[in-house]
């Protein structure tokens, strides 16, 4: 079994079952409790076969990850078409899109998706190449958010930004020398770009950004983790729109 064909952990498994993407459920054979009963009932309701399996076997399936005794074989993750996300934003008054430029850490992507779900982000756009996609680690870290936040995977981010501008979006990037986020005008259609963990936003994408935003800091470090920076800025938009 390929690790990309599974999700694991009670929350990720539950959300995948609710989304009807599960094919077979593997439960740790000595596991008991309310969570087990709930997941069993849900799997039965969704007509998903259940196999009681040893902890060792589950650990082998997940390549040693923390699975909590729950592993679900799933259909391949279905990315959303960019046009579907754009159609969705046309129905929204003030949509917020998140663009991840070359993010490579699955934990960062999972954390960002979890926050995106909490802050009403209309969709997330990631590149097909040189970037992490939706993996079991992403699914577990996101604790089910991948079933609720539309995620598009595109071949060319630069062309995608051109499309977004044609749709009336303002593009914002992150930079140490930008406008402080507390002075950020968050009205209208926003496309927020978060760069690679080490290199930041790529130079060709920077040229297309309308306004750079910075997060004021007063400590000794010069930058924040990508998922933390993304969370702060997503919540800044969310807070201003409450």
PLM region descriptions:
Residues 1-87:
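N-terminal positively charged helical leader segments and presequences
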Residues 19, 140-143, 206-242:
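Structured adenosyl-cofactor binding patch, chiefly the S-adenosyl-L-methionine
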Residues 56-61, 78-80, 157-161, 179-181, ...:
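A short acidic, often aromatic-flanked loop/helix-cap motif at beta-alpha or helix-coil junctions
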Residues 42-44, 67-71, 140-145, 189-192:
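Short, hinge-like loop/turn segments at secondary-structure boundaries
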Residues 28, 54, 101, 127-128, ...:
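Short beta->alpha connector loops at strand-helix junctions that form conserved
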Residues 15, 21, 87-179:
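RNA substrate-binding interface of SAM-dependent RNA methyltransferases
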């Amino acid at each position: 079994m390929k690790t990309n064909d599974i999700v694991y952990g009670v929350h990720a498994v539950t959300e995948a079952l609710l989304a009807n993407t599960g094919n077979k459920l593997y439960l740790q054979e000595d596991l008991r409790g309310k969570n087990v009963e709930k997941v069993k009932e849900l799997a039965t309701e969704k007509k998903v076969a259940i196999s009681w399996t040893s902890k060792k076997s589950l650990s082998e399936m997940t390549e040693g990850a923390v699975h909590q005794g729950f592993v679900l074989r799933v259909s391949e993750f279905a990315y959303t078409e960019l046009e579907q996300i754009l159609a969705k934003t046309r129905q929204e008054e003030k949509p917020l899109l998140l663009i991840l430029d070359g993010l490579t850490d699955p934990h960062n992507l999972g954390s960002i998706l979890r926050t995106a779900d909490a802050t009403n982000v209309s969709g997330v756009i990631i590149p097909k190449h040189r970037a992490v996609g939706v993996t079991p680690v992403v699914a577990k870290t996101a604790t089910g958010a991948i079933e609720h936040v539309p995620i598009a995977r595109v071949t060319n981010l630069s062309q995608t930004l051109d499309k977004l501008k044609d749709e009336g979006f303002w593009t914002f990037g992150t930079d140490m020398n930008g406008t402080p986020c507390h002075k950020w005008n968050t009205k209208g259609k926003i496309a927020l770009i978060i760069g690679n963990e080490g290199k930041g936003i790529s130079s060709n994408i920077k040229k297309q950004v309308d306004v750079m935003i910075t997060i004021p800091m007063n400590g000794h470090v010069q930058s924040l983790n990508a998922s933390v920076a993304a969370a702060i800025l997503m919540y800044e938009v969310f807070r201003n729109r409450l």
